[in-house]
Structure formats: structure tokens, C-alpha cells
């Protein structure tokens, strides 16, 4: 008999969201994600008790790193970045031993600065012991090409594989796995940088994710959410995440300009795609264009180098419009990322557009500094929200109740709020619950 796969829906969304061990409470009409596990590794999940080493050299994929650091802990695992930080050639970003390494778009892992809590650790790979890890993941980007020449890296992968650890790679991350001799004869996938080799030595499949025993491979960055779930299944047979495609038919508008918080845009975009939602980027011009500081350039850049259009997500997965051209009929929920994106919304008068969307009955979600824009649009009176501490005065002066220390995420009517980058998973579950229950 064919197994019935559970799907997240209006009737079970809160129960599914709480399975990780996060506490979800109802306070009047408010639903809040709260307790000590908010923004931290969760106590329950298929990766519970597992230590996952993520091997990176400079020029790694920022997008993949952002998602893994957000979701390994969400499924109960411990993420530790293993830095190939001694290489002095073939990198295009500063690589300082003892400091960390930098991604292709410039995020540094020393550790990732905007991620608090216990979601990440890091050390030089030379100081790590392969016996300490239940799984190793090698990221894509140019990182794999840089590390493949390093004997210490190849020997580390070989030792972990021989001991029975799971080995995973995304995109070009299979380059060191090929060199370590663990891909021969294996069913696998990958991007064009490894496909031609894998077709000769392995059983290549043009699929998003392929699992062959303890080898897990993903084709590209956009497949990272499915890759993480595939790793979960190798540790817990039969695991299926009910979030897969649960938002099919829903439309999410992400409001963006320069100086947005990279992780708060990248991870929601990747997860919303995984959950089946249609993603629309609504862009507006900033008051000042500081990243890059060039007039007339039609590219928006986050605090840590991610751009719109996205460098690592093909445009077939999302669309972009000028926010002024977006109609309320185009979306079901508008999402505001943090950093200085909300500041620009206020400074440019974009909050007037927000007022119109809210008056039309649309749901609005905001994380980190995002509540500042909600307050400026006079949408928080009588509402209870969470967010970064910098939003406190704005929310309270405009009549809202601000609970950043208590809540990781919250739903109050048509307002969804999230605390900081480390609470992106809770924020996304709150968005999912709100959309399913509307």
C-alpha cells in the first residue's frame, strides 16, 4: 500500500510546528512561538544528537551556508563549520587564518555574525577530528575547487566516510568527494562543474537530490532545503517534512531595497519555494544607494553582499517587480526583511504603499527591524509584536506592545512578526500558519 505523506494544513499546522520542541502558546488572539528553544537548536527532530561538520574554504556559497545554519539546528542537529583557512592562493576574498573564511558574496564565517544562539560553531579543520562528526557537508561555490588540493581535507573526508559518516555535497561541492574516491559507482547528482566527471565514474541522475546509502548529493543552491530533508531521512527512516509544497497556490511578496538583511531574504525565499509558494520580489529605490555606491545601477545589495536579482537562485523560481507596480491582487502576504531595509521604507515614504496593502486586507509579516516600518505605517496600535530591540521605541510610541525577549515569532491578526535572523525558521512557520489559516 502506498504511504500517505502528511501535509501541513490549517487543521494541523500548529501541532506540526511544535514538534521540534518549540513552545507555541495562545495569548488571547495572539499565537506566539516562545521559550528557551526560540532561535536555538531544537531538542527534537531527525538530526537530534547529530553533529554535522560543514567544510568550507573561501568563496563558498553564502546562500547554502545561510540555509544550513538555519535548518540543521531546526531539525535537532548541531552545525559546526570546519574552515579550510590556511590556503593562501586561489581565493578572491580575504582569508585570514584564525579569523575565518568569506563566501563568494562576502559573508564571513568567524562565525556568521548575525546568528546568535547555539546554532553554529566553527574551527579550523586542522583542529578537528573526523571521529566527532556524524555527517560532513561540502558546500558549492568556488570553495570546493580551493580545498581539493589540500591533503588534510581529502584525508579528513576519507576517514569520516570509512568510519560510516554521511557525506553530502551541493553543486560543485562534490569535487573533493570525487578526489577522495567515494563517488565511484554511486548514484548522484550535481551541477555542470562536476556532471561531466560524475557521468564517467558514477551513476549520474539529473535530479534535485539523490541519496545512495551514506552519500547525499544536491544539484544546486535552490535544492538546499530538499537536501537538508534528505539528510534527515538518512538518520530517521521514513521522515517526511509536511511543509513540502504546503503553500502551493499561495503568493508571497518580499519587499526589498538596498541594505536588507541577507539571511532574512535568502532563507525565506528558499524555504517558500520549497513550501510551494509563488515568490515575488517587490523592489523600491533606496533613499541612498550605498551598496554598491553607484548611481544608475539597477541591482539591490544586502548588508553582506547578496544581490537582487539573486546570484544563486535562477530567475525561473521567482519574479521581480517594482513595488509601485505591485497590486494587492498579486500577493497573499507581504514580507519585510530587516537590517536597514525598513529604514529605507520609512525614509522613502514606501510605508504609504504598506498602508494601502493593509487596508485592503492583506497580511503583513516583518522580522528584525521590520516592525519599524509597520509602526511608521500606523499599523501596530493595539497589536503585540516581536522583533529586534531597535524596533522597541517605534512600536511602543505608536501604540503597540513589544515582546522581543519573550517571543521568537508571533501572529496577531494579520500581522506576523519575527525576532532576529536566528529565528527565521520560527518566523517562516508563523507565516506558513497564517497563510494556511486565513
Please tell me what each predicted stretch does.
Residues 169-173, 367-370:
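Short, thiol/selenol-centered motifs that function as redox-active sites or metal-ligating centers
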Residues 2-163, 175-187, 195-360, 364, ...:
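Extended, subdomain-level signal for the structured scaffold at the beginning of enzyme domains
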